[in-house]
Amino acid sequence: MKLSLLLTAALTAIAPLGAADWTQFRGPNGDGLSGETGVPVRMEPSSLTWSIALPGRGLSSPLILGDKVFVTAGSGARQDRLHVLCFRVTDGSLLWERQFWATGRTMTHEKIGAATPTPASDGKAIYAIFSSNDCVALDLDGRLLWFRGLGRDYPNASNSLGMSSSLVVVDGVVVAMVENDSESFTAGLDARTGVNRWKLDRPKKANWTSPVVFKSPGQPNRVLLQSAQGVTAVDPTTGKIAWDITEGASTVPSLVVSQGRLVIPANGITVVEPGAGDAKPKSIWRSAQLRPGTASPVVVGGRLLTLNDGGILTCADAQDGKRLWQLRLKGSFSATPVVAGGHLYCVSEEGRVQVVDPSKAEGIVVSELALEQTVIGTPSIAAGSLFVRSDSRLVRLGGTALR
């Protein structure tokens, strides 16, 4: 196996993840939900705690672990300078920054960039991947643990629009989806060393969805891989396929797990329920009326919400898919909504934060705040705050000192 650079090191033992940590795309459970309290419902200019400039563009969500917030960026005319930065949650001060040269293709669609995928953390390290298929592991103090140039190891693994699948880390394995029209695969990288634990050939079609960890009491963890062909569940430690759903799925918004069911964007929404062990999931319901755009669906309080690119927020009963209401939000949307305190936080591409109460007979916009910045990436929630990453800045809304 070719490694562009491989440094191995023992990972420093630290305390377990706190309940408020935001450790991957769409939060600790990959569903967009946070148990955090105190996030402002009434967004107003005074909600701005701090706003700091970033050295480059990116769509990746911030990760928050304790009093540290981590974010990636890409800079340079060719987006070939890759950055991982760490700031202090309380005041936004820079704690450290690490830079790397990209080894793979960095050209992307103008709307995205090199730092599109969201990193992941197991509480011991930050694992970041870029559109160039460069993957790096750093400890929480910024020390390099390992670096994989997957774009160099697998030079045909790219697409003309750019790669955007985020990482997950589970059972000591970092799962990277590198799915495209040519050399398409998903790999399980050893979290300690970056070496392949396994590599699974995948459908040869461009795919921008992200892997999702499926946990069931008393059962081994599974990683769900979504593609145009459907959803595949794999053992994260071996890459062995546990089961397949082959009825097709979206290649942009990712599925979400709620109450043991999979809510899959697939020409609308398809909901399935896995059986005992590795039995193939059974279909629960389908709806062509619920059509997410770029944003992934979210389920809160028994209600399923989808948001399309034009700002139409649709709410349905999560049990049967019956549509309850629709609400037009201001602006266009790429970011997935996130939830705290039963409220939906939606951030438009124009940087307008809109807080929605989805629990009533009709959706209600409780408050809104114009950041006047371009926002494509999904926000994060921790420390009583909403963290929004724009094209040029990282913003904290709400919260004071870390509790």
Task: Annotate the PLM regions.
Residues S4-P16:
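Bacterial N-terminal signal peptides
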Residues L17-R403:
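Noncatalytic, solvent-exposed loop/strand surfaces
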